[in-house]
Amino acid sequence: MFKDFFNRGSKKKKYVTVQDSKQNDVPTGIMTKCPKCKKIMYTKELSENLNVCFNCDHHLSLTAYKRIEAISDEGTFKEFDKGMTSANPLDFPGYEEKIKKDQEKTGLDEAVVTGTAELGGIEYGVAVMDARFRMGSMGSVVGEKICRIIDYCTEHRLPFILFSASGGARMQEGIISLMQMGKTSVSLKRHSDAGLLYISYITNPTTGGVSASFASVGDINLSEPKALIGFAGRRVIEQTINEKLPDDFQTAEFLLEHGQLDKVVHRKEMRSTLESILKMHAGQEVNKDA
């Protein structure tokens, strides 16, 4: 009897395992989850809203071609230097495989798309970096393509718009990558000396050698809301100076407050803002409602 009493509590309980609904995967390509508020949206509707979250207004990344489409008159974009790809000058192990993988994943040849287009009937040169490709890192091809489009704009007296999105210099190309900082800056100096307009449009994230070169030297520097902009990482800086940094440090709003940006522009106002600037520079009448 006592044996049965003690064994009574040792019997296994019957239960059913319920799967956590949070582990269910969202169908690939059909839905997109906002990385900030976690709201799930139809990818098509999100794309039509320029990848701006309907719920929290977070600006998700925008591909290079989608951004060009958003700021160009229909059918006016002409791409330059398509097909230019990186070599492996330092014989860095696995570099070619990583480049090929990113090409297959993104449909891009490199981390920047360049060319000319028109906005409001005004022709301009454009370069748009795409962080999906090697985190938008700047190697020899990125630097060369940017220099070529800047030099074209200088020769043909065109304004130039550059959208940056980058983790910095590409480590697999070593000093050749770092050289692109000076190389692109020289091309921009020639463009500036010719009295031409350069608009730097900084998007999330823009760090390292890109933030320390062409991204920061526009005649007009714009950015998207909450974009991460900086050189070294937050933790590195705090450990170096032994101080706690402000919570909004290295954000677009922080840089605007400290005079390093001219304006933080919502993506829905991107096209109208750029068109107004181009028209002012061309001496044309600007729509006051823009």
UniProtKB/Swiss-Prot annotation:
Location(s) in or outside the cell: Cytoplasm
Amino acids binding Zn(2+): 34, 37, 53, 56
Gene3D superfamilies: 2-enoyl-CoA Hydratase, Chain A, domain 1 (3.90.226.10)
Zn finger (C4-type) start-end: 34-56
Major site of localization recorded for this protein: cytoplasm
Cofactor binding, note field: Binds 1 zinc ion per subunit.
CoA carboxyltransferase N-terminal domain segment(s): 30-290
Domain of life of the source: Bacteria
Assigned EC number: 2.1.3.15
Disulfide bond residue pairs: none
Primary enzyme class: transferase
Keywords, ordered alphabetically: ATP-binding, Cytoplasm, Fatty acid biosynthesis, Fatty acid metabolism, Lipid biosynthesis, Lipid metabolism, Metal-binding, Nucleotide-binding, Transferase, Zinc, Zinc-finger
GO CC term (a single one): acetyl-CoA carboxylase complex
Reactions listed under catalytic activity: N(6)-carboxybiotinyl-L-lysyl-[protein] + acetyl-CoA = N(6)-biotinyl-L-lysyl-[protein] + malonyl-CoA
Associated pathway: Lipid metabolism; malonyl-CoA biosynthesis; malonyl-CoA from acetyl-CoA: step 1/1
Gene Ontology molecular function: acetyl-CoA carboxylase activity; ATP binding; carboxyl- or carbamoyltransferase activity; zinc ion binding
Cofactor: Zn(2+)
GO biological process, one term: malonyl-CoA biosynthetic process
Membrane spanning stretches: none
Function, as annotated: Component of the acetyl coenzyme A carboxylase (ACC) complex. Biotin carboxylase (BC) catalyzes the carboxylation of biotin on its carrier protein (BCCP) and then the CO(2) group is transferred by the transcarboxylase to acetyl-CoA to form malonyl-CoA.
NCBIfam families (alphabetical): accD (TIGR00515)
Subunit structure, as described in the record: Acetyl-CoA carboxylase is a heterohexamer composed of biotin carboxyl carrier protein (AccB), biotin carboxylase (AccC) and two subunits each of ACCase subunit alpha (AccA) and ACCase subunit beta (AccD).
Family as reported in the entry's similarity comment: Belongs to the AccD/PCCB family.
Name of protein: Acetyl-coenzyme A carboxylase carboxyl transferase subunit beta
Organism: Staphylococcus carnosus (strain TM300)
Taxonomy of the source species: Bacteria, Bacillati, Bacillota, Bacilli, Bacillales
